Amino acid sequence: MAATNLENQLHSAQKNLLFLQREHASTLKGLHAEIRRLQQHCTDLTYELTLKSFELTGDSSSRTTELKRRCEELEAQLKAKEEENRKLLQELEQKNAAIAVLENTVREREKKYLEELKVKSHKLSMLSGELEQRASTVAYLTSQLHAAKKKLLSSSGTSDASPAGSPALASYKPTPPKDKLPETPRRRMKKSLSAPLHPEFEEVYRFGAESRKLLLREPVDAMPDPTPFLLARESAEVQLKERPLVIPPIASDRSATGQHSPARDKPHKTHVGVAHRIHHATPSQAQPEGEMRAVDQVNASKVVRKHSGTDRTV
């Protein structure tokens, strides 16, 4: 029994060994076939690579030259752009410096202009106040001259110098100029338009005979000349300007009594500058004298001043 079992085991072992040898041989055959196939593929690839390498060696020099030329062109363009950028930066810096200088100049000029404007405004306000005071003085002196003429006519024998039935006019007394009024933008503008350019002379309108306004030029501090109020100037060509009445008019002696005053009987020998030179002559026929205007309205800028190079003095 034991020998039979051993023989069976030996026989099965031999069969298994034979089977393994056959499988091993078939495996080796497949491996050899795969190796041959791979060797053939490698040979084909080597051949193709050799052919391509021969083709590339023909135009490699021209391609290299073209690439170098293109690279040099790009480098030149890059350098040009860098130079242009540098110039633009320099120009920008110069413009920024010029802008800073101009801004400083503008600020300095603006500061200087504001200072000058402040000084001129102060000077203008002072001159306006002085002008207003002098205008008030002129109006007050004009009223005093009217009163002096009235007294002169009454003392010469004309008792009808004032119209009857006007007690308010008879009791009228001129008053000195009032204090300076408060400044307002509108008054300041009117004063600036009528302010004189020369500080020593100014031209003002005065009332003359027959309600005519005589343009006289004289120093502002001098006493007004009473000649226009005492002498008749019928033939003089003077500038006329209507003004509203402030007080009732003073009737002339000629219109009330029909007589001439002693001052009117005198010949006209005095030459008066009235806006242009006027040669006086004795009138052939006496003209009626109008009503005399009294005090101007000072606060409404009624005193007219003109500036001229011609000296117009009485």
From Swiss-Prot:
Cellular localisation: Cytoplasm, Cytoskeleton, Microtubule organizing center, Centrosome, Centriole; Cytoplasm
PTM remark: Phosphorylated at Ser-192 by TTBK2.
Alphabetical list of Pfam families matching this protein: CCDC92 (PF14916)
Keywords, in A-Z order: Coiled coil, Cytoplasm, Cytoskeleton, Immunity, Innate immunity, Phosphoprotein
BP terms from Gene Ontology: innate immune response
Region (Disordered) location: 153-193, 251-314
Protein name (database record): Coiled-coil domain-containing protein 92
